Amino acid sequence: SPASGISKMDEWHVSVVAETGSTNDDLLRAAEQGELADRTVLRTEHQTAGRGRLDRRWDAPAGSNLLASMYLMSPGDRPTSMLQRVGVAIVDAVNQLAGLKIEASNRATLGLKWPNDVLYDGRKLAGVLAQRSTSAPGLIVGFGVNVAWAPPEAARVNDLVDCTAEQLLVEVLTAFDAQSGDPAVLAQAYRARL
């Protein structure tokens, strides 16, 4: 296993498609057919049936935002823990790209809102959604991050730093891997970013 701080990007199986209904639905179907490896990520340029918590619609112009889902074959991982872990990873990735430090002074600007939102200056920057299949092991965690486009009441990563969805995905996966798997440590990291 690579030493802490060394990228584990080669352990992720990342695919990109131009358009799909929902990356979560695609991975869920593939998991149920036994076709997925652990740490599979599906990113799309455009999602036509994306949704967030409470089945709220999540839509953006093609190519403008990070729309992705990951499949984690860790039956012990509770959906809430993975929501938190991905939320922390998104905050840390944006902080890393923007050159910000994780400290109390930044929390008011960039942080988490329970249970599954990332906010920048009080406006939604990202959302995370976890789903389990009833017939396959593992967990699907989808996330949408406003990178280059956001609705009027929301924020976008490009308000902080100029980057692409592809660059942000690499940082999110790297930040995800940098976190401890210990639930107590994860809970502390999550609370520190609220």
Place the predicted regions along the sequence by residue:
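Long, positively charged amphipathic alpha-helical accessory segments at protein N-termini or as interdomain linkers
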Residues: 1-7, 75-109, 120-194
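N-terminal lobe of the biotin/lipoate ligase/transferase fold
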Residues: 1-109
